[in-house]
Amino acid sequence: SCEGVRGYVYVDLKALLSGGFYSIPDLYVDVLNVCIGSGNQGIYPFNWRLYPTDQDVTSFWSSYYTTMMHINYAIRHMDAAYEYLTPDEQKKVDVYKGEMYFFRAYVMHRAALLFCEDYDPDKAADQLGLPYPKEWEPEAKLARGTLAKLYENVEADLVEAEKTVTAQGTPTDQIYLTKDAITAFRAELALHLHQYTEASQYAQSLYGTYPLVTTAEGLERMWREDTSTENILQLEVLRTTMTTVNSFGSYLNSSWKPNLGEYFYAPTYIPEQHIVKLFKDADFRTDIFLVKNANVTISGNKGVGVLIGKFRGNKNFQTNTTTLVYRNRPKMFRISQMYLVDAEAQYRLDPAKGLDPLNQLRTARGLAALAMSDVEKDVTLLDGTKISGLFNAIQEAVSYTH
């Protein structure tokens, strides 16, 4: 069925937005440190030793292009079924095809962030791109082409998507693609392509619809219950389907000690010290994003440390009150990301204005506004996006206030 092949692609996207697809890039850019008991998981990205035969590199490549194959198969299947559908069914399938065009653009952009040079408008016609399959041809051997051509294809697919995906979106944890989600992606894409005025405009157009969280309770619900007015697109996951997303257990690997009434941890990865220092005791994000004074045992060595707590998982997926599941509904787009896009874009246009959206985000999180002179070097916490932000000035200066 058309709904079936559509659903399969959504499952692929959930996998691409969880687990190692976040942690491996963060290892590469010194957000995380590898522990001695890791069994060498992630050690090559951590040491900046990237080889085409490395399992992390090959699994990323394979996952992105398997998803592309499923997207193109879905489009082909929908085209073949179209004449046999009722008019009402055809209207639905038109939307489904629009979703597939969007996901094709999104997946190729995500792959380009990892496998291509940073986009340079003056050099893109000569920079290597990636194969951009548009047909279901599993055995095809496509040329990489240029980065300029890749983003021409991305734009063409977005235009196709916008023809049929017209549902506006609401701040109610949308699980399927909306017009607002496309706008959010256009904001991120415009920033990457150095189209700063457009990036700012796209981002700002969503502010009025998706209110920022302003309390610790609201932020905790975002990560422990997967519900928030900030979610522009959050893919559906249930307790019965939570294995469709990858685990973040490597940040904690917790075990509950009932006789002591507390957790003990054996993490694979821990945050770098410069990340820990970004959080102050008065910051209401601290107890949500970090586990402080954690009892840690690594390869027989016991101590107390600070761990990543952001991905404890949705507590409604737990079968009891103490066994953490380390899985969440993937948040493809959130309004807080739009404030960061806007901040970066405005900074590029006029450094004096770059702090305006950043400070709106900071004050919503209960933090003091910053002056340009006291902006701290900061990063986005564990969203796997820092690797693509290495070339962005203000992303080197914003805290993961979202």
What feature does the model see in each segment?
Residues Y196, P351-A352:
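TPR-repeat structural position
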Residues T401-H402:
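Conserved small/polar residues in nucleotide/adenosyl-binding loops
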